[in-house]
Amino acid sequence: VEGERIKEMMIQRKNMKYRLVFQGIIVGLVTGVVIVLNRILINKFSLLFNNFYSWGNKDLLKAILVIGILATIGIIVGIMVKQEGMISGSGIPQVKGRVINKLKMNWSRILIYKFIGGFLALSAGLSVGREGPSVQIGASIGEGVGEKNYKNMPVKKEFLITAGASAGLSAAFNSPLSGIIFALEEIHRNFSPLVLLTVMPAAITADFVTKRFLGIEPALTVGAMDALPLSYYWILIILGILTGIMGVIFSKGIYLFQDLYSKFKNIPQEVKIMIPFVLTAIIGLTAPMLLGGGHELILHLALEEKSILFLTIIYIVKFLLLLICFGSGVPGGIFLPMLLLGAIIGAIVGSFSIDVFGINSSYIINFIALGMAGYFASVVKAPITGIVLIMEMTGSFNHLLSLSVVVIISYVTSELLRNEPIYEVLLERLLKRVGLTKEESDSKKTILEFCIEMGSIGEGKFISEVHWPKGCLLVSIKRGEKEIIPTGNVKLIGGDYIVVLVNVDRRCFIIEEINKLTLV
């Protein structure tokens, strides 16, 4: 009977590819429409809030009214976070936790609350980004589609969650390739063909929808750049080291402010979230240039050269504003603010190089873009995504070499300083705070797929030599286009995909154990 069940599941797995492609398109279509609506509303209401701040700085009474209204909005958002804790922060750690089945979430509730909460925070001008919320909104839509089609097949549902996350980032940035790579490299941590089949149509469809309504330009672009001459590449070593170090400080700052907020247990959540709204009101009344996640500032840096002192002050202020906002738990991400800080570091190095080494001032844009990639690699530890994202922003592959140099040096610097990927750490902290959810205890089976990476413990071992975790059965090995029957004398080689049948109730444990075997 067990053999028949395995055979039936393998047949379903082969036929499932076409369904996943179609459902990936559906997820991308819905996510694209929702994110387009979100972006349009944020753009419209951001202008209203900016005008409101301009009106409020005319006299003291008006200013007090502005602060009072922002405080009220902060309390409303705080109540929403209190009612649905999973909408706090970026949302990317929550999606990662859901994909590995360590968190359970009410997708429809999160979709509504995150949309409204993120919209209010971003429209008001808080120093957070829309990319993280877009990823969580997309993942919620993916889970909703999966709930309708794969209620009793958790792995298939998680493919669609990953597809939704990819579509969300694609729609937020108008960068489909970045969305695909980010979902595979950061969310799913697996370049499985089945995942790719689901993620690609979702990201491309979401990008098509976004471009149809909002134009074909990337949401964040630094404009055309000339290729940096090889004679200047030694400066990239300095930039890589600096972005690596500053990225580590960024991560530590995020954790520090989360801890500071959590120490005040007697202060209600809505009051904590009110704090950044009040601070944003004061910033809007006095220095509106500092509002928002950083999109306008990045464009401003690319258009006009600034002094090193000015850039340093902007960096410190925006860094502190982000820490205060994100630490409170407000629904908003760190993705765009992180890119802004990297852009400022790049601008500082570029300005210094222009002043001291006499390089052409036109290359300041190169340093801004390279700074973003290096900072991203140091903080997120997803170097491929960092490179691809900046290439999509610049619309050119001519900068692959310079991007790779900065990203690798920044990544290695971050590794030497023992900096962990920020979304992994935020997930661990979230799990400690809420406690692990119990997995369903039943006898249901599901199929998982893992890639044997080159240099992993499993590479070069015979199947009979591997200590497979209890509750799993190796049913197939995919080597290129061939499918191999897994007997004890078959040797695993790098690039193999192993297909494993597991008990649903031990799924999370088995994933962790097999990842130790397959990942480097």
Question: What do these predicted regions represent?
Answer:
Residues 1-435, 454, 479-481, 495, ...:
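Alpha-helical transmembrane segments and immediately membrane-proximal extracytoplasmic
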Residues 515-520:
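A common structural junction motif
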Residues 89, 116, 444, 468-471:
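A short, polar/charged loop/turn motif at coil->beta-strand junctions and beta-hairpin connectors
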Residues 425-464:
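Extended boundary segments
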Residues 95, 443-445, 485:
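Short, solvent-exposed coil/turn segments
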Residues 297, 445-449, 497:
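Intrinsic-disorder/low-complexity, polar/charged segments enriched in Ser/Thr/Lys/Arg/Asp/Glu/Gln
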Residues 454-510:
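Cytosolic Rossmann-like ligand/nucleotide-binding regulatory domains
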Residues 368-369, 379-380, 442-444, 467-469, ...:
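A structural signal for short secondary-structure junctions
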